[in-house]
């Protein structure tokens, strides 16, 4: 197997926006918290054969740093504070935090260290893994093929939406972590800018800066997971996470992720003060229609007009699924659709990787993501899963992976 030695990544900002948003909050409030995160391949692919090439790319990441132009760009955004940006300017990836092994064909990756540093590994490392694997499996794929497939998808969308008022349809690129390559992501987002008036932003800060579009993203599961050990009371951990986010971002970045435990458990914690303070909610697992109906009903119970709030759908979407959801909800609530893999790795003959890196420990103790889809549950410690389910008054469910 040919080892590609040139760096895949060229910018510290080639990552999802919410990583920097969370990193700033961790820098300000949880500077000394330590965590561990691990790689999971939800499919049955044996990716261990690529361990050496991935490790080489990880080693090259230590040379990434914030450029003067990037520093100036981040400084222009209203929610970043100068102390954090000054610290980020000096940040360098530490490859010693990352253990990469070929375990009998299986790819094992574990990342350990201070949360403020570990937090930045996930997205670029997943993008590296995806690009390494795809360029070996599909070496002849071109950007033209990706654009041709996008054109087909857009034409299908236009045909299917001919009788729909799309004035409130909004699309965001969430495609960094499982993209075929960085080049293809940039090509796709550029094509959408030119041909799809409903694109409102990208989660990738590097692309947002260079292409002049809005960066989008708030927080991820790890924000809620870590609070399971940071909060003195497990049953209060989700509320603690929501409260600390508002402390860091009282007027910006107000979309809350609902499925670290489950939507039902989330809504029990999401009382009137939270529902008023947050601008909306993000769906990432479970049936999206059921979830949206629950969200709207919750706002109505609290006497909040759902049309004053936004629901973000981001779970395995394509344009057809987004259109179905838009038709169902567009008269009742504001909508945004975050699409990832189906934008940046939608190429005939290419099977996208179903890969994640998730927090598994905080301060040496287990954390869990349960979610509204049992297949997405992540925790190494069954006893802790039982504790969590008991604390949040959840029924028993299938064993975690």
UniProtKB/Swiss-Prot annotation:
GO terms for biological process: NAD biosynthetic process via the salvage pathway. The keyword Membrane does not apply. Keywords: Ligase, Phosphoprotein, Pyridine nucleotide biosynthesis. Pathway: Cofactor biosynthesis; NAD(+) biosynthesis; nicotinate D-ribonucleotide from nicotinate: step 1/1. InterPro entries: N/Namide_PRibTrfase (IPR041525), NAPRTase_N (IPR040727), Nic_PRibTrfase (IPR006406), Nic_PRibTrfase-Fam (IPR007229), Nicotinate_pribotase-like_C (IPR036068). SUPFAM superfamilies: Nicotinate/Quinolinate PRTase C-terminal domain-like, Nicotinate/Quinolinate PRTase N-terminal domain-like. Coiled coil: none annotated. It comes from the Bacteria. The modification Phosphohistidine is found at residue 221. Transiently phosphorylated on a His residue during the reaction cycle. Phosphorylation strongly increases the affinity for substrates and increases the rate of nicotinate D-ribonucleotide production. Dephosphorylation regenerates the low-affinity form of the enzyme, leading to product release. It catalyses: nicotinate + 5-phospho-alpha-D-ribose 1-diphosphate + ATP + H2O = nicotinate beta-D-ribonucleotide + ADP + phosphate + diphosphate. GO terms for cellular component: cytosol. Its EC number is 6.3.4.21. GO terms for molecular function: nicotinate phosphoribosyltransferase activity. Catalyzes the synthesis of beta-nicotinate D-ribonucleotide from nicotinate and 5-phospho-D-ribose 1-phosphate at the expense of ATP. NCBIfam families: NAPRTase (TIGR01514), PRK05321.1 (NF003704). Belongs to the NAPRTase family. This is Nicotinate phosphoribosyltransferase.
């Amino acid at each position: 197997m040919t080892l590609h030695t040139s760096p895949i990544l060229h910018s510290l900002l080639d990552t999802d926006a919410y990583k920097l948003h969370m990193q700033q909050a961790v820098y300000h409030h949880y500077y000394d918290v330590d965590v561990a995160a691990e790689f999971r391949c939800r499919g049955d692919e044996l990716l261990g054969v690529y361990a050496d090439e991935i490790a080489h790319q990880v080693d090259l990441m230590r040379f990434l740093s914030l450029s003067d132009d990037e520093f100036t760009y981040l400084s222009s955004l209203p929610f970043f504070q100068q102390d954090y940006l000054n610290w980020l300017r000096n940040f360098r990836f530490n490859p010693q935090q990352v253990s990469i092994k070929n375990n009998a064909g299986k790819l094992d990756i574990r990342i350990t260290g201070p949360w403020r540093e570990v937090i930045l590994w996930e997205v670029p490392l997943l993008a590296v893994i995806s690009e390494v694997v795809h360029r070996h499996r599909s070496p002849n794929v071109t950007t033209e093929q990706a654009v041709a497939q996008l054109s087909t998808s857009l034409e299908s969308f236009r045909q299917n939406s001919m009788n729909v008022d799309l004035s409130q349809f909004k699309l965001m690129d969430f495609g960094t972590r499982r993209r075929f390559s960085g080049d293809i992501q940039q090509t796709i987002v550029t094509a959408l800018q030119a041909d799809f008036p409903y694109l409102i932003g990208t989660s990738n800060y590097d692309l947002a800066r260079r292409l002049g579009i809005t960066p989008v993203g708030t927080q991820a599961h790890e924000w809620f997971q870590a609070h399971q050990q940071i909060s003195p009371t497990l049953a209060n951990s989700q509320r603690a996470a929501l409260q600390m986010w508002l402390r860091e971002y009282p007027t910006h970045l107000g979309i809350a992720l609902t499925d670290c435990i489950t939507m039902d458990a989330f809504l029990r914690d999401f009382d009137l003060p939270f529902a008023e303070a947050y601008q909306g909610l993000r769906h990432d697992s479970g049936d999206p229609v059921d979830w949206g109906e629950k969200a709207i009903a919750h706002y109505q119970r609290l006497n909040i007009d759902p049309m004053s709030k936004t629901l973000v759908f981001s779970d395995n979407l394509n344009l057809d699924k987004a259109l179905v959801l838009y038709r169902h909800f567009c008269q009742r609530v504001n909508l945004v659709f975050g699409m990832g893999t189906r934008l940046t790795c939608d190429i005939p003959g290419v099977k996208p990787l179903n890969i994640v890196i998730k927090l598994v420990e905080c301060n040496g103790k287990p954390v869990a993501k349960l979610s509204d889809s049992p297949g997405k549950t992540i925790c190494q410690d069954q006893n802790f899963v039982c504790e969590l389910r008991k604390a949040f008054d959840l029924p028993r469910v299938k064993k975690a992976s």
